[in-house]
Amino acid sequence: GTGMVATNAVKQRTGNVSAGTSSFSMIVLEKELSKPYEMIDMVTTPDGSLVAMVHCNNCTSDLNAWVNLFKEYQELLGIPVDMDEIYSKLYNIALTGDTDCGGLLSYNYISGEPVTGLADGRPLFVRSANDKFNLANFMRTHLYASVGVLKIGNDILFNEEKIKVDRITGHGGLFRTKGVGQRILAAAINSPISVMETAGEGGAWGIALLGSYLVNNEKKQSLADFLDESVFVGDAGIEVSPTPEDVAGFNAYIENYKAGLPIEEAAVKFK
């Protein structure tokens, strides 16, 4: 529950997404789901509310590997390397790409993904001769892939179970480059995403806040009230809403992604 605490997402109708080496979403529910789902785990907030959790084994590792390749190229040219600048340039150029990534596909499976039924994984980049292959689309497809499996799981919650949320907050390394990961995630789950200044801190920040709650809660407040009134004090972070174009593009991408999963299965079998 440290991610929930770090993002002030312990109340019903709130949620958080942690996106780093792996990723997960936690949506605090008002009521139980209509039925069990293999890809959705049921947990609780630290103070007992029901939470629907989608966990993905892979998120930014493959994306980071590609960024490191560009770092090596920059070093080859004898240009001083600033990793924050490289990430910023590559992530922001992705936002200029086609919303469906021009047909390009990426499977970021360093390991298997239970949500898509794969016990093992192979990182793959796939394109056809007629796809729009350029740097913007290349980076965009890898950003999409970082939250693609998360989208598949959350589509069940929002489209089939009709879950309603007032606020979803993102944290973790994907959000260090301002505005980009946030916009990609907003398109993926068709929901406004808030990111706080502490977005890159994740679970460690949540652990510290839980410790503070145990030690400094002189008013004997509930955890939610303590976070609202003593920690965040109205700070909901900076919110980015999805655009219809981004949502439609990501939906088209994820249909291609799901159709291409046999390619990933074949790679696992033969490589």
Tell me the role of every PLM-derived stretch.
Residues 1-169, 174-271:
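Active-site core segments that coordinate phosphate-bearing ligands/cofactors
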